[in-house]
Amino acid sequence: MAGLDYPNLVLIRRKARGLAGRMVAGWQHERMIPEFVRRAVDLIESAGPEPFFLYFPMCPPHNPIVPAPEFVGKGGVTGRESRYADWVYQGDHMLGQILDALERTGLAGHTLVMATGDNGAAKRPYPPLREAKSSIYEGGHREPFVARWPGKIQANSVSHRTICL
């Protein structure tokens, strides 16, 4: 299985084989993810009065787990899961930078912001949901969805409706 997330990875009989070398000379995930955020913020800051659409698929919390050096040790967790916690912390920071840019530019008051996952938990079920990623059961496709739209969505409101993006 090869996909957009891992174009240099091929799964053969449940064994991962990476292709030799990097896809692009000099590519470093640790440095590129902050660059993606910088470019998103630049787009927001240069948007002007016309409506625009920004799709920003964040890498955290997906693999590869490669927090930038400035986030190492910031996740508040020690031991085996510390690197993953740093990665999730970096993801939170990334979203915060985008929200801050919307505030600074005065766009936050009339901008719909959505944050969601793309599938259920990857490796194990999380009760009360049954199963995990790639399953037809709820644990394979139910994930959090958060939306902020001042004047349209009440802050701290909860909806139990099914949505589809």
Over which residues does each language-model region extend?
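Formylglycine-dependent
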Residues: 1-51, 58, 64-67
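The substrate-binding groove and active-site-proximal loops of carbohydrate-active enzymes
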Residues: 21-34, 76-90
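Non-transmembrane alpha-helical segments in soluble domains
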Residues: 37, 41-45, 92, 99, ...
